[in-house]
């Protein structure tokens, strides 16, 4: 997958919030790995990209034939569970600017370049906040020179600075991904 996909939970009133993010390090379709036919979340591509698609029957057959595939995907599932757990705490304890910086870093880790398509509307849904809150937070990050935000397009201009503005959740999630699946961010120029 070359974009960023979000696992989003939609409430009865239609409001949605992100409960997990994946990109080139993972896959969507976790319920099949866990032998469930019901998905409690919807998958939404938040940053456009490409992905390979595999019929469920072929996926399940590959899992039956390969213990190593099952083991790798199970480790990813645990990494995603860790991320989801951390996001619950993050949404409770950290301010919008910190969460915005965390989300942008997580997306940046999964992208091949520093700029990507992203609207305030999408980011507000991912963070579970009002669009106006994202506009303020993104404006603050932009004023600090950490990002450039143009209509529907964000560029990370100072990754180190953005890392300093992000809450501890970014680092906690990243360390677990590195430990469990060997996922590490791309090399960044100073």
Where are these regions (language model features)?
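Glycine- and acidic-residue-biased ligand/ion/polar-headgroup-sensing regions
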Residues: 1-13, 23-25, 43, 100
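Alpha-helix/helix-capping structural signal
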Residues: 2, 57-58, 121, 160
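Structural motif
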Residues: 4, 48-51, 153
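Short acidic-glycine loop/turn motifs at beta-strand connectors
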Residues: 12, 47-48, 150
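Cyclic-nucleotide recognition modules
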Residues: 18-78, 86
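Polybasic "coupling" helices that flank or enter modular domains
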Residues: 46-48, 63-130
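Alpha-helical bundle regulatory/interaction domains
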Residues: 58-59, 81, 146-147
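Phosphate-/nucleic-acid-contacting segments
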Residues: 106-190
